[in-house]
Amino acid sequence: MLDHAGKVRKLDGSEGDAAKIEAWRAGVTQLAKLPHVHIKLSMLGFLVPGWTDDAAKEAIVIGLVKELLELFGPSRCMFASNWHGSGASSNADYCDECQPTMTELYEKFQAWCDGPLGLDAEAQALVFAGTAEAFYRI
């Protein structure tokens, strides 16, 4: 299980992001070729601190999540909050303010699924529960 969306770190929309994203993309592309590798779509603030307060940063997160869904497919991606390890936050990497709440995160991710991620009901069922149920055998 690959956590935190593959751990590309502290993107902010600057020129330096391109090299980080290319290195991340090369790694996750290779990992996605391995059928037993799954990925958690978690700790989004670890990737892009402040994404909840900045539309441009949120767009970066959406793009990364969309790319992971395309690489791994919904059956190997799972929504995760990193609760309780990071408290009630997904934007905390111990450098940021702890937000959003779990409810806000879920609502935001759901809106992405219905909107820019374009996931149908079957794909959403996998990302929000089915993938975890299968992976963890619950």
Predicted regions located by residue number:
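Histidine-centered active-site/metal-ligand motif
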Residues: H4
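H/E-rich (His + Asp/Glu) clusters that bind or coordinate divalent metals
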Residues: R9-I138
